[in-house]
Amino acid sequence: MRCWNCRRPSGYREQVLKAIGGLAIALANDGKLEEAQQELDTLQKKGASFGDCDLVAAEILSLQKNYDQALALYIKVFNEVEDPQLLSHAYLSAANAALNQDDMEKAVRILKQGCQNLPEGQAVLQKVMLADLMMQQAASDKENAEEYYAEAQQLLEELVDSGYDTIATRLNLATVLQALDQYSEAEKVLKDLQEQYPSDYRFDMQMAYLLIDQLRTSGWLK
């Protein structure tokens, strides 16, 4: 009898393990924790790497709200996994676990580490999340707001320059520029959006806020 298993293509085992790990994470995210645990057990029995197993285990722990244990595993994964997609997922999940503990500073540290360690072009979502956290911190910490807004500006401009120029990214950039009193730059961003999306009222509204802010700053409106 011919052994068809012996003729499996190169990388077949890795593809199977990746599929099992992906299924386990999907089940965990869907709230099917018992089934996710079964897939994790299968992953371990088939000799998957520590990194793959730890990432799945961390996802399950996080969804069970065991954030301390989940974070400990995510941090292990940072040094165990080389696949950029899995590593990116680990950084985002770890940051979310920290936020679920109301520890924004830890989340920021994790995201900054991800931006530094992930390959160029693979840290887009980390930058998006980090920019959002910088804006939140600026809004809550008036004394250091300028510093936080400046960090957010740098991240958002990097995203736009890299091609990730979504409406949300550009609107956030306009908001940050306005907060830093860079009115002409903010106006340019909004005008570009108005020209590109003429039926979207959000840009007209933000342009109006920008004008009012300028008038107040100049003393014309009190």
State what each model feature region is.
Residues 1-222:
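Alpha-solenoid helical repeat scaffolds
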